[in-house]
Amino acid sequence: MRPAPAILLVAAVLLSLPVTAAAQTPGEVFRKVTPSVVVIKARGSEVTAAGQTRFLETGSGVLISADGKVMTAAHVVATMDEISVEFLGGETVSAKVIASESAADLSLILLERVPAGARVAKMANSDTVRVGDPVYIVGAPYGLSYSLSAGLISARWAPNTVHRAMPLAEFFQTNATINTGNSGGPMFNAAGEVIGIVSHNISKSGGSEGLGFVVTMKTAQQLLLEKKSFWGGIDGQFLSDEMLDILNVPNNMKGFLVKSVAKGSPGDEAGLVGGTKVFTVGGEQFVLGGDIILAIEGVPADSAASMMKIRDHLATLKPGAPITATVLRKGRVLELTGVVP
């Protein structure tokens, strides 16, 4: 007996439909991805009212290449003196920053070596993610390593719409729990592929309130892998006209006040000096005594827009190329020279 034409038509339609992988349970996703997730412990120093103090920052990250590249958040590692990375099996290796973009809260670090058993994560096209999609975050909230939280994509935000200090970041908003220690960790889709890097949450209580923000993988790949944003290893702030007057900066000079410099960073190698004392002016705390950067490569360092131009230029330079910085130090204008790492 020959099949009826209608049955043949239905069969043809079914065969033409795309085949999708079976949905994985949260436990299956967790077991699949944890060999690629790392816990980051970074040591730095800061100036407080009590003087120079050491501190430890704990965050998370994800291994994205066989040669040891790990994506994480800039605020976890960008101005730290020492970075150690712990894998699922407990093995710890040293790492260094090789690219960073504070305007998107992203950093790329390179491991001294890749432990046996570590697994490179698969990165997904974050443009295909939709509001309502299930997501999973693995990290170390409050130092509790390899904790899983689950949720949904709540919204998607274009660059320069959520956080003025991070104008380059496209964000996913999620109700998956994000706490201190999750920063820099990966957010996975239901297939266990990385779709973003955890940045921060918005909270009135200090805990997680369902407003978590994750930088999309599209932004991370563009800034860290394609563009390789320059890492200088410095932290500081632009000086207002009021502060320029208070500090008696001559000739209407404007610039960027250096608060701290990471040991071994390009800024450190160039001879930049960080602050030494904390002062309160108009209710706001400043770490003073450090260099004021007036220009880098001849471009004034007087605003966020000018710093973007500087970063774009530095990203085009090859390793070993010289970098010049004009700084004001104790009333004297100096020219410092460093090199691209």
Each PLM stretch: what is its role?
Residues 28, 74, 96, 110, ...:
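C-terminal recognition in membrane/secretory proteostasis and scaffolding
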Residues 46-56, 80-83, 117-118, 138-151, ...:
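Active-site loop architecture of trypsin-fold serine endopeptidases
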Residues 21-60, 69, 73, 82, ...:
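N-terminal activation segment of mature serine protease catalytic domains
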Residues 57-61, 121-125, 142, 171-188, ...:
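Gly/Ser-rich catalytic serine loop of serine hydrolases
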Residues 45-46, 63-146, 180, 230, ...:
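Conserved active-site neighborhood of the chymotrypsin/trypsin-like protease fold
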Residues 61-63, 95-97, 153, 187, ...:
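Conserved hydrophobic positions within beta-strands
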Residues 7-18:
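Bacterial N-terminal signal peptides
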Residues 81, 100-104, 154-162, 240-241, ...:
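Short, conserved beta-turn/loop elements at beta-strand boundaries and strand-helix junctions
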